[in-house]
Amino acid sequence: MERGEAGLVPVDEGWFVVNAREMEWLAVDGSGAWTSFEGPHIRFEQVGVALNVLGRGDAMAMYHAEETQEDFLVLSGEALLIIEGRERPLKAWDFVHCPSWTEHVIIGASDGPCIVLAVGARRKGVGCATR
């Protein structure tokens, strides 16, 4: 691990243990903050993992669908899931499974932070479709 401007980043493909608070975090107005546990030159080839911290109204992404499976676990707070055109409230410990091409977005709905763990399968050359 190496210290970057915004926290720790992995520098090689070996194993590591790190506290999420020490990782490099990115933030965009309206999208909250997140860390992917990856670095600029290190990318997990098989599975993407991200920890997202959402404020009220922050969207994790655009309303979209992925070619591969995505799963989400709300660790704290509350969120609104929009999935296949339907709304569903989420709370701590709710798990969301999105098979391939399931349109979805998660939006923070708490007065305090909503923390969501996201895990997605990866295949080379695979992207997502946004609407």
Positions of PLM-derived features:
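Double-stranded beta-helix
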Residues: 3-4, 105-131
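Conserved short histidine dyad/triad with adjacent acidic residue
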Residues: 30-37, 50-66, 100
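Short beta-strand His + acidic residue motifs that chelate non-heme Fe in jelly-roll/DSBH
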Residues: 61-62, 81-82, 98, 104-110
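Short, conserved beta-strand element in jelly-roll/cupin
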Residues: 46, 51-56, 65-82, 121
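Short acidic-glycine-tyrosine-enriched beta hairpin
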Residues: 71, 85-101
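A short, N-terminal "cap"/entry segment at the start of jelly-roll beta-barrel domains
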Residues: 1-46, 129-131
